[in-house]
């Protein structure tokens, strides 16, 4: 079980809701993945927009909703969006996203820290999407964030753990859960994040744009379980020199 703030999750795979062809396909993929925490953009909560009703199928699944502030370019915009989400969904949980650059969608560290500090004081459970910066992640932890969500690679890029070495430092130093978010494009990437010691991963694009999102959701669930189990079991040390698994020295000397 994974505990974030006051909530326990039976799955360490968190999922998103964007880029799916249909809401029912999104819901089926989420169910197949076993995910119990699902993030959704606040800007998609438009009353009367029935053709993009993602809320109803998610509520039917009984998952915990994590509204995000995607689209916010400043701390002020993110705080405003957070208030809207709390009013609309009745939750104080929030994935904080502030990325002013529309091309690479890299998070703004200064505005993110500023918004996080204010939102924590207002009683929000803040999970900030941020760069793989160990210093920033520690600062976010210190201001009261319930978890940190450093990126593996730019959003939707499917590049995997480009920031692997920095993620390892963040995981080593963190006293709150570390959720690797963004850039995870294959189940093997998710497994690698868990092998590093990550507490959870968030996956959206890789599932949503696959030929079979339901099957891909299931594949990610299996990969997350495998990676986590490998981490707990203890991976063997890497080395440049060979080490025979079945030495024959005694046998050969006896001939």
Curated annotation (Swiss-Prot):
It is an enzyme of class 2 (transferase). It comes from Aeromonas salmonicida (strain A449). One of its GO terms (molecular function) is thiazole synthase activity. The active site is at residue 95. Its EC number is 2.8.1.10. It is found in: Cytoplasm. Pathway: Cofactor biosynthesis; thiamine diphosphate biosynthesis. Homotetramer. Forms heterodimers with either ThiH or ThiS. GO terms for cellular component: cytoplasm. Keywords: Cytoplasm, Schiff base, Thiamine biosynthesis, Transferase. HAMAP family: ThiG. The keyword Protease does not apply. It comes from the Bacteria. Catalyzes the rearrangement of 1-deoxy-D-xylulose 5-phosphate (DXP) to produce the thiazole phosphate moiety of thiamine. Sulfur is provided by the thiocarboxylate moiety of the carrier protein ThiS. In vitro, sulfur can be provided by H(2)S. Belongs to the ThiG family. It catalyses: [ThiS sulfur-carrier protein]-C-terminal-Gly-aminoethanethioate + 2-iminoacetate + 1-deoxy-D-xylulose 5-phosphate = [ThiS sulfur-carrier protein]-C-terminal Gly-Gly + 2-[(2R,5Z)-2-carboxy-4-methylthiazol-5(2H)-ylidene]ethyl phosphate + 2 H2O + H(+). 1-deoxy-D-xylulose 5-phosphate binds at residues 156, 182-183, 204-205. This is Thiazole synthase. GO terms for biological process: thiamine diphosphate biosynthetic process. Pfam families: ThiG (PF05690). Its main location: cytoplasm.
């Amino acid at each position: 079980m994974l505990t974030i703030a006051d909530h326990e999750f039976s799955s360490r795979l968190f999922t998103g809701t964007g880029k799916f062809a249909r809401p029912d396909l999104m819901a089926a993929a989420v169910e197949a993945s076993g995910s119990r925490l699902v993030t959704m953009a606040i800007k998609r909560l438009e009353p009367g927009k029935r053709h993009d009703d993602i809320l109803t199928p998610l509520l039917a699944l009984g998952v915990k909703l994590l509204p995000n502030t995607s689209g916010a370019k400043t701390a002020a915009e993110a705080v405003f969006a957070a208030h809207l989400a709390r009013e609309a969904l009745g939750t104080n949980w929030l994935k904080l996203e502030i990325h002013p650059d529309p091309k690479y969608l890299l998070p703004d560290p200064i505005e993110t820290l500023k918004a996080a500090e204010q939102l924590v004081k207002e009683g929000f459970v803040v999970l900030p999407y941020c760069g793989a910066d160990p210093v920033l992640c520690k600062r976010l932890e210190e201001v009261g964030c319930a978890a940190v969500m450093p990126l593996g690679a730019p959003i939707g890029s499917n590049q995997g753990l480009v920031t692997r070495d920095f993620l390892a430092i963040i995981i080593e130093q963190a006293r709150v859960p570390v959720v690797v978010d963004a850039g995870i494009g294959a189940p093997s990437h998710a497994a690698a994040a868990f092998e590093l010691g990550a507490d959870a991963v968030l996956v959206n694009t890789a599932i949503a744009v696959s030929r079979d999102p339901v099957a891909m959701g299931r594949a990610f669930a299996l990969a997350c379980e495998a990676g986590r189990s490998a981490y707990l079991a203890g991976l063997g040390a890497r080395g440049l020199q060979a080490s025979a698994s079945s030495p024959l020295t005694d046998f050969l000397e006896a001939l």
